[in-house]
C-alpha cells in the first residue's frame, strides 16, 4: 500500500507538470524570467577614490542616470584601480601602493568597507541605490578619501550600519576587502589601462568603454533588448 501511495504521488506530480507545460504556464513563466534577465545589464566599475576621471564619471554619468536606469542595471563597484598589493607571508599584513598615494588607499578601503556593509545588511532591492548614493556622495566631496563616514550619515544609513563601516575601516577586514578588489582587478587587466574601467555583462571591450565614458545611458539603452526606460528616448541618450 505504501509503495502504491508513493507511485501515485509521483504520477500526480508528473501529471501536474505535464498539464502546466501543455497549457504554457511554465514556459510563460520561464519566458518572463528570461526576458527579465535579458533586460538587466551588469555593470562592473573599476575605479579609484582620488582619480579625477573616476570622480567625474561617477558624479556626472552614473549618479544622475541611476534613478531611471536602476531597474535595468546591476552595478558592482570595485575601488582599487591601478594600485598594487602584496604580503610577505600568507598570514602577514597586506601592503598596498596606490596611484595617488596613501590617502587614496585609505579612501579605497573606506569605500570597500561601505560597499561590503551595505551589501551584507540590506535587501537586494535596497543595497544598490544606497551603494550608488554613498559612493556618489564620497566621490563628489572635497576629500573623497575621508568622506565615507559623513556620507554614510548623509544618505541615511542606520547607526548600526555606520558603526559596521567604522569598525571595518579600523580593522584588518578593510585590508582584506581591498586585496580582494585587487585580485578581481588584476584578473581583468593588470594593470588597468584606464581608470575608471567599465565592463558590461562581464566582458571588456574598448567600444563599450569609450561609450560608457562619453554617454553611459546611451550604452545601457543599446544593450537593453526589451522594455526600455524613458531616458532612452531623451536627447542625452541619443547624442
Residue spans for each PLM region:
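Sterically constrained small-residue positions within well-ordered secondary structures
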Residues: 34, 66-68, 189
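C-terminal cap of thioredoxin/glutaredoxin-like
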Residues: 2-5, 40-46, 141-239
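Eukaryotic intrinsically disordered and solvent-exposed regulatory patches
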Residues: 30-31, 61-62, 182-186
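Structural alpha/beta surface segment adjacent to cysteine/selenocysteine redox centers
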Residues: 39, 44-49, 55-155, 235-238
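N-terminal signal peptide
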Residues: 2, 14-40
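Charged/polar interaction segments and conserved charged motifs
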Residues: 3-4, 18, 22, 110-115, ...
Amino acid at each position: 500500500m505504501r509503495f502504491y501511495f508513493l507511485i501515485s504521488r509521483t504520477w500526480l506530480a508528473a501529471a501536474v507538470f505535464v498539464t502546466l507545460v501543455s497549457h504554457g504556464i511554465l514556459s510563460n513563466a520561464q519566458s518572463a524570467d528570461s526576458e527579465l534577465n535579458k533586460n538587466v545589464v551588469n555593470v562592473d566599475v573599476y575605479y579609484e577614490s582620488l582619480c579625477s576621471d573616476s570622480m567625474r564619471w561617477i558624479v556626472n554619468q552614473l549618479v544622475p542616470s541611476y534613478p531611471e536606469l536602476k531597474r535595468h542595471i546591476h552595478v558592482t563597484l570595485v575601488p582599487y584601480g591601478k594600485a598594487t598589493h602584496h604580503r610577505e607571508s600568507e598570514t602577514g599584513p597586506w601592503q598596498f601602493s596606490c596611484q595617488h598615494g596613501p590617502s587614496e588607499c585609505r579612501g579605497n578601503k573606506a569605500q570597500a568597507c561601505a560597499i561590503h556593509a551595505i551589501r551584507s545588511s540590506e535587501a537586494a532591492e535596497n543595497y544598490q541605490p544606497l551603494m550608488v548614493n554613498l559612493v556618489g556622495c564620497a566621490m563628489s566631496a572635497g576629500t573623497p578619501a575621508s568622506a565615507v563616514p559623513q556620507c554614510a550619515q548623509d544618505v541615511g544609513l542606520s547607526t548600526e550600519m555606520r558603526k559596521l563601516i567604522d569598525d571595518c575601516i579600523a580593522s584588518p577586514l578593510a585590508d582584506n576587502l581591498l586585496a580582494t578588489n585587487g585580485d578581481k582587478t588584476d584578473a581583468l587587466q593588470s594593470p588597468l589601462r584606464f581608470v575608471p574601467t567599465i565592463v558590461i555583462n562581464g566582458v571588456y571591450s574598448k567600444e563599450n568603454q569609450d561609450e560608457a565614458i562619453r554617454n553611459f545611458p546611451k550604452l545601457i539603452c543599446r544593450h537593453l533588448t526589451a522594455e526600455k526606460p524613458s531616458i532612452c528616448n531623451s536627447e542625452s541618450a541619443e547624442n
